[in-house]
Amino acid sequence: MTLVHMNLLLAFAMSLTGLLMYRSHLMSALLCLEGMVLSLFILATITTLNSHFTLANMMPIILLVFAACEAAIGLALLVKISNTYGTDHVQNLNLLQC
């Protein structure tokens, strides 16, 4: 395992740790999720380039499309929740409340 792979895995682990520690606000959770997806995208791109497997060349592009969709849906939910509740605290998102 090269130093680049170790750094990308460390970036993924730090984003996951940030998601677990700072999950009180929706915006910080979305930023940590975006960091995780971005590190996975770079890792998938490097792995695809090193493996020379031609059928796997589409995997990073598909991952990038899903990341863009995830970011758009997350920001739309953030705007809707901020307009409805006036805050972006995750604890206010209980579906059992009337």
UniProtKB/Swiss-Prot annotation:
**Keywords recorded for this protein, A-Z:** Electron transport, Membrane, Mitochondrion, Mitochondrion inner membrane, NAD, Respiratory chain, Translocase, Transmembrane, Transmembrane helix, Transport, Ubiquinone
Biological processes, Gene Ontology terms: ATP synthesis coupled electron transport
Q: What is its EC number?
A: 7.1.1.2
Keyword Zinc-finger found: no
Name the record gives this protein: NADH-ubiquinone oxidoreductase chain 4L
InterPro entries linked to this entry = NADH_UbQ_OxRdtase_chain4L/K, NUOK/Mnh_C1-like
Task: Report the superkingdom from the record.
Answer: Eukaryota
Bilayer topology reads: Multi-pass membrane protein
Quaternary structure, per UniProt, is: Core subunit of respiratory chain NADH dehydrogenase (Complex I) which is composed of 45 different subunits.
Signal peptide coordinates? none
**Intracellular or extracellular location(s):** Mitochondrion inner membrane
State the organism named in the record: Pontoporia blainvillei (Franciscana)
Protein task: Core subunit of the mitochondrial membrane respiratory chain NADH dehydrogenase (Complex I) which catalyzes electron transfer from NADH through the respiratory chain, using ubiquinone as an electron acceptor. Part of the enzyme membrane arm which is embedded in the lipid bilayer and involved in proton translocation.
A GO molecular-function annotation: NADH dehydrogenase (ubiquinone) activity
List, alphabetically, the GO terms of the cellular component aspect: mitochondrial inner membrane; respiratory chain complex I
Please list every transmembrane segment annotated in the UniProt record, as residue ranges.
1-21, 26-46, 59-79
Q: Which family does it belong to?
A: Belongs to the complex I subunit 4L family.
Q: What class of enzyme is it?
A: translocase
Catalysed reactions, as listed in the record = a ubiquinone + NADH + 5 H(+)(in) = a ubiquinol + NAD(+) + 4 H(+)(out)
**Gene3D superfamilies per UniProt:** 1.10.287.3510
